[in-house]
Amino acid sequence: MGEKENAPFQLTFNGFLKVAFQGSRITSDAGLILVRELDERLGLEQIITEHLSDSRQGLNTQFTLADLLRQSVYSRLAGYEDLNDAARLSADPTFRLIGSPKIWDRGAALTSTLHWFETELLTREENLVGLMPVNRGVIGQA
């Protein structure tokens, strides 16, 4: 009763995506590309921007909040229990692809940046409060 019915939608894929076998550039986390496409379709980045605050300014901002949250959440989805693998995942082709375009060449965040994000930035009162509408926003779009 009163439930919103969503029409089925089709995911589109990044045109830069290539499937090839090169031993030094293999990833076991390619399934996250589908999650990233879903995240884009649901508008996660916009929802994060609306509800989480970032006090960083200028050159201190190498990664957006959305990139940091994606890397943190996606690494857990891929089975990495903590931040110990962040340095290795920074160079992983999938973790580069799921971030914003500036990460594609540079690589994802390292352990120290993710640790700061999870223990300092994300735990600020305004962001703890903001996580509730982020969750509701994503669920509401699904």
Language-model features: where?
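Dynamic "connector" segments at or just before major functional cores
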Residues: 1-142
